[in-house]
C-alpha cells in the first residue's frame, strides 16, 4: 500500500529511469544526521499525504529567504555531484517540510532512489525509515 501511495506522487513526475541521463548523487551525511536528531526528538509526522505536504517551489524560496543554503541542504538526502553549490539543483530527495520528518517523505525518497538506482540514498532512506518506525512504536 505504501508503495502505491508513493508511486502515485513520484512516478508521474520522474518518468522511467534512463541511466545514461541520470545525474550522479552522493549521500548528504549532514541531512542524515539532522533527520536522526529530529526522529530522536520525535519531530516527525507518521501519516501525511506527501504529495500535499512536500514543499513546493514557493515554500522552498521562502525557507531560503530566512535560512542559509546549509540549512536548506540538511533537508535533502542527496547531493547532485554535477550541480553547483547553492543552487536548488544541487539538492535532491527531500524528506520533510522544513520543520519535521515525514514518514511518507522517507518512503518517497527510498522509492525514487530505488527506481533511479541510487543505492546509497535508498539505503540511507531505509535506515531512517526503520529508525522512525522503531522510535514511534
Give the residues covered by each predicted segment:
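A charge-rich, low-complexity, intrinsically flexible signal that marks solvent-exposed coils, linkers
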Residues: 20-137
Amino acid at each position: 500500500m505504501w508503495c502505491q501511495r508513493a508511486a502515485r506522487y513520484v512516478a508521474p513526475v520522474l518518468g522511467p529511469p534512463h541511466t545514461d541521463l541520470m545525474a550522479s548523487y552522493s549521500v548528504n551525511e549532514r541531512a542524515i544526521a539532522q533527520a536522526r536528531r529530529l526522529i530522536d526528538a520525535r519531530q516527525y509526522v507518521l501519516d501525511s499525504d506527501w504529495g500535499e505536504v512536500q514543499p513546493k517551489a514557493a515554500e522552498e524560496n521562502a525557507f531560503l529567504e530566512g535560512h542559509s543554503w546549509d540549512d536548506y541542504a540538511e533537508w535533502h538526502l542527496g547531493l547532485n555531484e554535477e550541480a553547483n553549490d547553492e543552487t536548488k539543483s544541487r539538492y535532491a530527495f527531500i524528506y520533510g517540510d522544513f520543520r519535521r520528518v515525514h514518514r511518507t517523505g522517507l518512503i518517497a525518497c527510498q522509492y525514487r532512489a530505488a527506481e533511479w538506482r541510487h543505492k546509497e540514498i535508498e539505503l540511507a532512506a531505509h535506515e531512517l525509515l526503520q529508525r522512525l518506525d522503531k522510535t514511534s512504536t
